[in-house]
């Protein structure tokens, strides 16, 4: 027997509590329970669970998240547009997102996504963070497969006192590949803190520190849509070393409830990221089907982003206008 999840959700993406049957837009919601049942470890793992959302070029074999909504591709130079707790998080350099500190995923489909700043015509993804709890909990997960892909993650949350609680999440991945000379490694650390200032006011602090490194791999070339080399063949240079991404993110959110109908939300986020490394990439396969032109690039990109947002949410009785 299956159970249907309550469709009335307090959505940080749509800014209000609603029943999905009563709003004029298409929204797919993946809860923590669904992600655990389907063993979702990365955003890519969740795409097969949502209609109209498809994986796209992830930049050299997985250096950032990228997908399309309803056939509309996202920015090829920055990856997919997404928000976290209602604020943009994917501007500039961004490492692939880990879901160890994600409570739920919201996929907003259609032009409504354009209401939230840098959006796409096809849609937008919102990441809802897990929050510190006032009951002590810990969780350890281990994962391995026959392709020498290993992952370990640890989560812990506990109260400090009646007003303060913290949460820590750590994850490490070491991934080999069926392709020659291709591998990747990632460290992820996320400390969070919640302060209940009063019954009506709460302050939340989230942070993420991601370091991702791996072989930049463009795949293999084809001639007339046919493979002309073994799919395992790496066409770059192993001596180039790894391409490395450092992605550090901080978000501070303040919420104050004036009464059951009116609420003030204010937030600020800061993001600092860097991508650096050499990579030799295939450029063009010549007509003989045997000669591959290549080019060697050095990337040293940095990005810094600051975002602030304040919202006043409330209910207004418009029955007089009916």
Language model: regions and residue ranges:
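Outer-membrane beta-barrel channels and translocator barrels
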Residues: 161, 196-200, 259-261, 313, ...
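Outer-membrane beta-barrel translocator/receptor signature
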Residues: 78, 91, 100-103, 114-191, ...
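N-terminal, post-signal-peptide soluble/periplasmic segments
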Residues: 3-18, 26-28, 75, 80, ...
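Transmembrane beta-strands of outer-membrane beta-barrel proteins
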Residues: 138-140, 166-168, 203-205, 264-268, ...
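Acidic/polar loop-and-plug regions of large Gram-negative outer-membrane beta-barrel proteins
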Residues: 173-177, 187-257, 267-303
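Transmembrane beta-barrel architecture of outer-membrane proteins
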Residues: 30, 38, 64, 122, ...
